[in-house]
Curated annotation (Swiss-Prot):
EC number of the protein: 5.4.2.12
GN (gene name): gpmI
Record: residues binding Mn(2+) 1: 409, 413, 468
Species lineage: Bacteria, Bacillati, Cyanobacteriota, Cyanophyceae, Synechococcales
Organism expressing this protein natively: Prochlorococcus marinus subsp. pastoris (strain CCMP1986 / NIES-2087 / MED4)
InterPro entries to which the protein is assigned, alphabetical: Alkaline_phosphatase_core_sf, BPG-indep_PGM_N, Metalloenzyme, PGAM_B_sf, Pgm_bpd_ind
Record's protein name: 2,3-bisphosphoglycerate-independent phosphoglycerate mutase
Length: 540
């Protein structure tokens, strides 16, 4: 049991006014107007809030979120850092250190898989996102696995490439394929067996027909091998205006998953690897009809979901005393809401990888629109999300509310400037309504983001920029009339040079709850001039 359990803390009565955390996913800060969807959008609400209320810019990338210096942040890492109130060494760093130190041969689950493959004389299949984006995977980990397979004398290795084009430039796959081919040549093991764009195999929105298409490419014994080189396939696709993210699944060797084979998925981020691994591993599966279900041993780099019938190379480290846990153990109710694309982030990731809600934690999912890409519906489900969350706030039941607006990130990923501007303007309208609902209840609200994206829509080469950024993100604090900061005077300020890890301690201070020692972040609140909500209402 946590040291901050309800047994040893004086319980606070449920207040009539909430503390709200609004996360504008992908809303970064960048001064330049050029190629900046946020600066070019009409945002009267956010502009008014920024000028009228205490604000600061906080770090959301690199070492400030447990990633290598210069590595862009992402939604998983951002929500994990916010919810934990500390900087946690991320899986990218953890696994990279093992690979760089040539320690894959010391990983027990990899040892067991190597022995099993050699005993069965089967094929080792390796799949994962092949890029250096560092959000879901890293190509260095694949190259390390090829070297490991050579050292373990595994004879048959089939590599199933997932192309990126979302966390990397849209037409950058050839660079990574060349690295793979060079590594295969150097260590004299492996071949490229198939290619598939991440759009198909890494869906997380329960659009199972995408997953099915990738599944068939990996498993169908009657699947047709296409006589084409990876480079020629890329050129053919680019000429047809199909970029890396959307490459059609193809098989370029005779290797497919079959009985007695083994599979390693080297993605370390769970959310976009779950659906394909479920389809490949679960006996009870009804999301689509599987014509061929190969009996293969599966090893994933990290835990994608509790109780999946797979082995894990790098099991999760035990984490304790996240903000949701502290709120729950003090008898307070909390409300988490997002649309489908970001629902795992305000629940699973925000809670440190815990699937099950804490006592008193209410979750509400708003379905994302079923479109091919979100530039086709830049408003997404923000309006429905806003109505639902506003109603929850006004019930007075919840002490702590977390809402995520997905639009800046999901539409920013499309590289469509006009659509991103619409997405930003939608969120601007919606955040005003959330602020007003909070104000009506006398509550306080923190508005921030988990990482940047929509503030940069083109790269230096003039091509659409579909990845995240390393820019700082805004944070605005509005104190409610019934949610005054305990033991503070009339003037307070927000700290500068802060990071996402400082948000949870700030929220706990607003909730008048103790900050556990595990939270190494520090409250953002110093002396600032307090103002009410009256200046916001007139703009909404």
């Amino acid at each position: 049991m946590s040291k901050f359990s309800s047994k040893n803390i004086n319980k606070t009565k449920v207040p009539e006014s909430p503390v709200v955390l609004a996360i504008l996913d992908g809303w970064g800060h960048r001064e330049e107007n050029l190629d900046n969807a946020i600066k070019n959008a009409n945002t009267p609400i956010m502009d008014s809030l920024w000028h009228a209320y205490p604000h600061t810019l906080i770090n959301a990338s690199g070492a400030d979120v447990g990633l290598p210096n210069g590595q862009m942040g992402n939604s998983e890492v951002g929500h994990l850092t916010i919810g934990s109130g500390r900087i946690i060494q991320q899986e990218l760093v953890r696994i990279t250190n093992v690979v760089k130190n040539n320690q894959l041969t010391q990983v027990n689950e990899l040892k067991e898989m190597a022995n099993s493959i050699k005993k069965k004389k089967g094929t080792l299949h390796i799949t994962g996102l092949c890029s250096d984006g560092g959000v879901h995977s890293h190509i260095d980990h694949l190259l390390g696995l090829i070297k490991w397979a050579s050292e373990e004398h595994i004879e048959k290795v089939a590599i199933h490439i997932i192309t990126d084009g979302r966390d990397t430039p849209a037409k950058s796959a050839y660079k990574y394929i060349r690295q793979i081919e060079d590594c295969i040549k150097k260590f004299k093991v492996g071949e490229i067996a198939s290619i598939c764009g991440r759009y198909w195999i890494m869906d997380r929105n329960l659009i199972w027909e995408r997953t099915e298409k990738a599944f068939v490419n990996l498993t169908d014994p009657n699947g047709k091998k296409i006589d084409i080189s990876p480079a020629d396939y890329l050129n053919k696709s680019y000429n047809a205006n199909i970029t890396d993210e959307f490459l059609e699944p193809i098989r370029i060797s005779k290797d497919f998953l079959k009985d007695e084979d083994s599979l390693i998925c080297f993605n370390f981020r769970p959310d976009r690897a779950r659906q394909i691994i479920k389809a490949l591993s679960e006996k009870e599966f009804d999301n689509f009809k599987r014509k061929s279900i190969p009996d293969v041993d599966i090893l994933t780099f990290t835990q994608y979901e509790a109780n999946l019938p797979v082995k894990i190379a790098f099991p999760p480290e035990s984490l304790n005393n996240f903000i949701g846990q502290i709120v729950s153990e003090n008898g307070l109710k909390q409300y988490r809401t997002a649309e489908t694309e970001k629902y795992p982030h305000v629940t699973y990731f925000f809670n440190g990888g815990v699937e099950v809600p804490s006592p008193g934690e209410q979750r509400h999912l708003i379905p994302s629109p079923r479109v091919a890409t979100y530039d086709m519906a830049p408003e997404m489900s923000a309006e429905e999300l806003t109505i639902s969350c506003s109603n929850a706030i006004k019930t007075g039941q919840y002490s702590f509310v977390v809402i995520n607006f997905a639009n800046p990130d999901m539409v920013g990923h499309t590289g469509n400037m006009a659509a991103a501007i619409k997405a930003i303007e939608t969120v601007d309208r919606c955040i005003g309504k959330i602020v007003n609902a909070t104000g009506e209840m006398g509550g306080s609200i923190l508005i921030t983001a988990d990482h940047g994206n929509a503030e940069l829509m083109k790269g230096p080469d003039g091509e659409p920029w579909t990845a995240h950024t390393i820019n700082k993100v805004p944070l605005i604090f509005i104190e409610g009339e019934k949610r005054k900061i305990p033991n503070m005077g009339n003037e307070i300020y927000l700290r500068e040079n802060a990071g996402l890890a400082d948000i949870a301690p700030t929220l706990l201070q607003l909730l008048n709850l103790p900050i556990p020692k595990e939270m190494t972040g520090k409250s953002l609140i110093k002396e600032i001039e307090l103002k009410g909500f009256n200046k916001v209402v007139q703009h909404v």
